Amino acid sequence: MLRFLVFASLVLCGHSTEDVPETDARVVGGAEARRNSWPSQISLQYQYGGSWHHTCGGTLIRSNWVMTAAHCVDSPMTYRVVVGEHNLSQNDGTEQYVNVQKIVSHPYWNKNNVVAGYDIALLRLAKSVTLNNYVQLGVLPREGTILANNSPCYITGWGRTRTNGELAQTLQQAYLPSVSYSICSSSSYWGSSVKNTMVCAGGDGVRSGCQGDSGGPLHCMVNGQYAVHGVTSFVSSMGCNVARKPTVFTRVSAYISWMNNVIASN
Amino acid sequence: MTPSISWGLLLLAGLCCMVPSFLAEDVQETDTSQKDQSPASHEIATNLGDFAISLYRELVHQSNTSNIFFSPVSIATAFAMLSLGSKGDTHTQILEGLQFNLTQTSEADIHKSFQHLLQTLNRPDSELQLSTGNGLFVNNDLKLVEKFLEEAKNHYQAEVFSVNFAESEEAKKVINDFVEKGTQGKIVEAVKELDQDTVFALANYILFKGKWKKPFDPENTEEAEFHVDKSTTVKVPMMMLSGMLDVHHCSILSSWVLLMDYAGNASAVFLLPEDGKMQHLEQTLNKELISKILLNRRRRLVQIHIPRLSISGDYNLKTLMSPLGITRIFNNGADLSGITEENAPLKLSKAVHKAVLTIDETGTEAAAATVFEAVPMSMPPILRFDHPFLFIIFEEHTQSPIFVGKVVDPTHK
């Protein structure tokens, strides 16, 4: 028991220290994440033309369940999840590939209306993955938690590093401080497009999520611990890194009960 | 001395502006409400769908390695107009060749539907950028039936030219000038040669350069490879558009389906077959599937790459229409006595169809300026129209196929 507690403590400490950014030099405006910095991050891929294509990120929340965005799985394609991934085009030696067996999108999700919210889905994997240094469960916030404005957060993913650009090959991270609902829903920001069931982060015109990051996590530090507070959802059609158009996430703390119920009944 | 056999040349470069109303003198047409006309137009759309696909398959049969581009509406309306001046088998073959079921649709309804369709396409306030024109070229010693001439002018907006076909170079120039002027110089030398005994010619043209509701950004256009076939690749300017578009994968057709709206109530359906599935697509496509595609919009995030191109079609309609059963009008047994008062039989010795389309980045300014929406951030499927694909352009209200095209090599005009 004590040994386990010591191990858990070491993991948390390691996670904290390694995540202090050196520089944010270039997600859009991000930098390559250190290998196994974000072990709950997954790559969601679909099969087309005889090969697999990355479409979204996601968060491993149980050894056989992944949390992602509902819009990521709107199309009836064959999907798989890759955990322990770092370089999409190389064999890192740490990957585990597992098929998606079942998709449960939020019942109120409307694929023609992303700004209504409910952009969240759970994927049951065909088998449980093996947890290790490179594959961990994401820590979720307590139900109802609201982030303070300007909380320190990181978006991670393999999304485009430039509007209309190429996917990143290695996992990227970008520092996106949170933007409170009252600011984000003001008329000079997103206005009424943003709902209280969402989280905003970034909006400096430099750093943002971009295509390929959807479904992936927004890791925010609260009380010295990172938790996944957001599921990457949408940006402006004018471009990914538009000033005063923060990246918008589904607020995880609004869906804790729903997720627990889905997992319990499937 | 009048030749024993009169020859008629029909040049179809496009869309008839108006279909003449029913010519029979003893039938008094009553006005019908707009509501009543709409179902009739859809009747025509249904029939033109079958006609368009039959015509397409005939063209593929003639050559499956060439670009294809034609206007089903244009060809159908020209022949429907000719049916008003024809009788007997000549008359019957035309209507059945256009795939009208004469036991289900009356002839009066057919012509009424064409009239309504053409009024829709040529509305003065329409944002559609269709250029169409019609010319009747009559030998200076031939007298046309007054009724037919009147209808051609009033409903067809035809211009009538008296020419001396004995001077074939001069006659050819008159016809070519008419078409060239109407197409802003896009179609030159529409007629390359005239048969010695031609006494009657009809010229139509159609030119379309629409504006997208959701335009491409020219800055995103760059040179890319287009795979004509397994061993041939050409360089083309490839336009790019990313956003919420009407895209889905159709497993029945083994193809990706893209809908792009033009300003002015027209839509283009692009069909991109999976590798090796073009023949499957061509054999499987039918009007029911197309109707479903037009009615079921499925917006999703997608990135498309499509060639900027100008495509034209130039066809011998005798070769094309004969397999559809329209043969009598082209041979010595033709009965076109409703067109000319001469006792000598008139014959369609040559029929040519030409159409021109430009696909480029242009969109409506207002649409571009006001685009603002939230965009989900999944990595969009990237559809590269970098190998042969089909497209069909429809008038939205009637679902009439204005154009059908197959791009095998975008560098061929």
From Swiss-Prot, chain A:
Annotated keywords: Calcium, Disulfide bond, Glycoprotein, Hydrolase, Metal-binding, Protease, Secreted, Serine protease, Signal, Zymogen
Protein's GO biological process: digestive system development; elastin catabolic process; exocrine pancreas development; inflammatory response; multicellular organism growth; negative regulation of transcription by RNA polymerase II; pancreas morphogenesis; positive regulation of angiogenesis
PROSITE patterns: TRYPSIN_DOM, TRYPSIN_HIS, TRYPSIN_SER
Main location group: secreted
Superkingdom assignment: Eukaryota
Lineage summary: Eukaryota, Metazoa, Chordata, Craniata, Vertebrata
GO MF assignments: metal ion binding; serine-type endopeptidase activity
Gene Ontology terms: cellular component: collagen-containing extracellular matrix; extracellular region
Cofactor remark: Binds 1 Ca(2+) ion per subunit.
E.C. numbers: 3.4.21.36
Name by which UniProt lists this protein: Chymotrypsin-like elastase family member 1
Cysteine-cysteine disulfides: 56-72, 153-220, 184-200, 210-240
PANTHER family from the UniProt entry: CHYMOTRYPSIN-LIKE ELASTASE FAMILY MEMBER, CHYMOTRYPSIN-LIKE ELASTASE FAMILY MEMBER 1
Names of the cofactor(s): Ca(2+)
Propeptide positions: 17-26
InterPro entries reported in the protein's UniProt record: Peptidase_S1_Elastase_sf, Peptidase_S1_PA, Peptidase_S1_PA_chymotrypsin, Peptidase_S1A, Trypsin_dom, TRYPSIN_HIS, TRYPSIN_SER
Pfam families in the cross-refs: Trypsin (PF00089)
Region forming the signal peptide: 1-16
Species in which this protein is naturally found: Mus musculus (Mouse)
SUPFAM superfamilies (alphabetical): Trypsin-like serine proteases (SSF50494)
UniProt-annotated glycosylation sites, renumbered to this chain: 87
Catalysed reaction equations from the record: Hydrolysis of proteins, including elastin. Preferential cleavage: Ala-|-Xaa
Peptidase S1 domain sequence ranges: 27-264
Family, similarity comment: Belongs to the peptidase S1 family. Elastase subfamily.
Keyword Calcium carried by entry: yes
Curated annotation (Swiss-Prot), chain B:
Annotated CDD domains: serpinA1_A1AT (cd02056)
Record's keyword terms, sorted: Acute phase, Glycoprotein, Protease inhibitor, Secreted, Serine protease inhibitor, Signal
PROSITE patterns: SERPIN (PS00284)
Region RCL, annotated ranges: 368-387
Signal peptide: 1-24
GO molecular function, one term: serine-type endopeptidase inhibitor activity
PANTHER family in the record: ALPHA-1-ANTITRYPSIN, SERINE PROTEASE INHIBITOR, SERPIN
UniProt record similarity statement: Belongs to the serpin family.
Domain description: The reactive center loop (RCL) extends out from the body of the protein and directs binding to the target protease. The protease cleaves the serpin at the reactive site within the RCL, establishing a covalent linkage between the carboxyl group of the serpin reactive site and the serine hydroxyl of the protease. The resulting inactive serpin-protease complex is highly stable. Variability within the reactive center loop (RCL) sequences of Serpina1-related genes may determine target protease specificity.
Known function: Inhibitor of serine proteases. Its primary target is elastase, but it also has a moderate affinity for plasmin and thrombin.
Miscellaneous comment text of the record: Murine alpha-1-antitrypsin is represented by a cluster of up to 6 individual Serpina1-related genes. The precise complement of Serpina1-related genes present varies according to the strain of the animal.
Name the UniProt record assigns to this protein: Alpha-1-antitrypsin 1-2
Organism: Mus musculus (Mouse)
Gene: Serpina1b
